[in-house]
A protein has these predicted regions:
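Flexible, glycine- and charge-enriched loops at secondary-structure boundaries
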Residues: 49-56, 149-153
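N-terminal [4Fe-4S]-dependent radical SAM core
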Residues: 1-30, 35-52, 65-72
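Generic, well-ordered alpha-helical segments
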Residues: 25, 51, 55, 82-85, ...
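Conserved AdoMet/S-adenosylmethionine-binding subsite of the radical SAM
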Residues: 64-68, 72-75, 80, 84-167
Length: 167
């Protein structure tokens, strides 16, 4: 690994996932999430510390070995934690996947989304490499959302509107 290689904090891999997108998928669970959902399936991913540090290239090389299981409908899903907290890493990982014609899916709460122009530029780059976007909206009602997650949902709803407007 070079000093300039982009790295990410990876909690774990599920090499034969059947619920995080269509077909058989290799699911990468990233470390770090600001929400504290009462019914979280992965609370061990909340801390930004922990997991293993990977370069996007090394991680892709590892998961690409499972491609024969994916068939024409499967591929890679990045989840978390909150993958948008490591957007540059996910973008590089998906860029490597697209070079090999691998289907990509992003499973996110959208909690870190904002309408800042520099953020949107980075987000749009990621979207260009994402085949399936899974937005996990916990609750539309702001007070219920805060009660369930400990966070407001303004950024999440802004993301839903942004996706609807920008297809």
């Amino acid at each position: 690994m070079t000093d300039t290689a982009l790295t990410g904090q990876v909690h774990s891999l599920e090499t034969f996932g059947l619920v995080d997108g269509p077909g058989v998928r290799c699911v990468v669970f990233l470390q770090g999430c600001k929400m504290r959902c009462r019914y979280c399936h992965n609370p061990e991913t909340w801390s930004q510390q922990g997991g293993e540090t990977w370069t996007a290239e090394d991680l892709f090389r590892k998961v690409y070995r499972y491609r024969n299981y994916w068939g024409k409908d499967g591929g890679l899903t990045v989840s978390g934690g909150e993958p948008l907290l490591q957007m540059e890493f996910v973008t590089e990982f998906f860029n490597l996947a697209k070079k090999k014609q691998v289907n990509t899916a992003l499973d996110t709460s959208g909690n870190s989304f904002c309408l800042d122009p520099s953020y949107l530029e980075r987000f749009d780059r990621l979207m260009d490499l994402t085949d399936l976007f899974l937005l996990d909206i916990k609750a539309v009602d702001a007070s219920l959302h805060k009660q369930l997650t400990g966070q407001d949902n303004a950024g999440i709803l802004a993301l839903a509107h942004y996706l609807a407007d920008h297809g």
